[in-house]
Amino acid sequence: MDFWVKIGNAIQKIDYHISHDPEIAGKRFEDHVRNLFSIKYFTVVEKTHFFKTNTEKNMDCSKNPDFIFEYIPTGEKFAIACTYQTQLNNQNQLEWSNQAQLKRYQEFEYERRIPVFIVIGLELPLKSKYYPDAIAHEKFMFNIPLKNATYPALNREVFANFGREYERPFFWKNGKLY
């Protein structure tokens, strides 16, 4: 039995790293974002459960942003909502939420009196005239204060102003997340 458990665990690890399933890709992106916060300066105060867990246990906390961090030197807190997308919509907009979710995040920010940032991962296929069958992707990341993400779908003029390097660690300064 131990052998089959190990095989199952190995398959899950492989699936986590290569799956295109939206739920798994979203979890992978959340983990990536979490790892961009240095444990020397940040601590996770709250983390929502995986969506599937919340659904199975009928939990309400998945309505909150994914993380609440504390910046250790000052004790300031802020929330992060992660979303991972693989395309723009037909109007060339980046859809990051629905209207109900946007409203919940706005209420959360107001009630908790802490800023909420929307961290969006966008992975788009690269097109090459030399290798038309090649599967390559370019990854983008955006860090948008909720006050600037006023609609569930954002125009390029909005989200392009908040681009950041995909692998660059986050830092906090004067109430702003960079």
State each model region's role:
Residues 1-9, 17, 21, 36-39, ...:
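Non-catalytic C-terminal interaction segments of nucleic acid-processing enzymes
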Residues 11-35, 56-57:
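A short, highly charged nucleic-acid-interacting micro-segment common to nuclease
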Residues 18-20, 54-62, 88-97:
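Short, flexible/disordered intra-domain loops and linkers
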Residues 24, 47, 90-92, 159:
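N-terminal targeting/trafficking signals and adjacent low-complexity tails
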Residues 34-62, 66-70:
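A short acidic/basic microdomain associated with nuclease active sites
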Residues 37, 65-89:
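Conserved catalytic cores of phosphodiester-cleaving nucleases, focusing on short active-site segments
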Residues 45-46, 79-81, 116-120:
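A structural signal for short, well-ordered beta-strand segments and their strand-loop junctions
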Residues 85, 91-121, 125-126, 130:
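Short, charged, amphipathic alpha-helix that recurs within catalytic cores of restriction-modification
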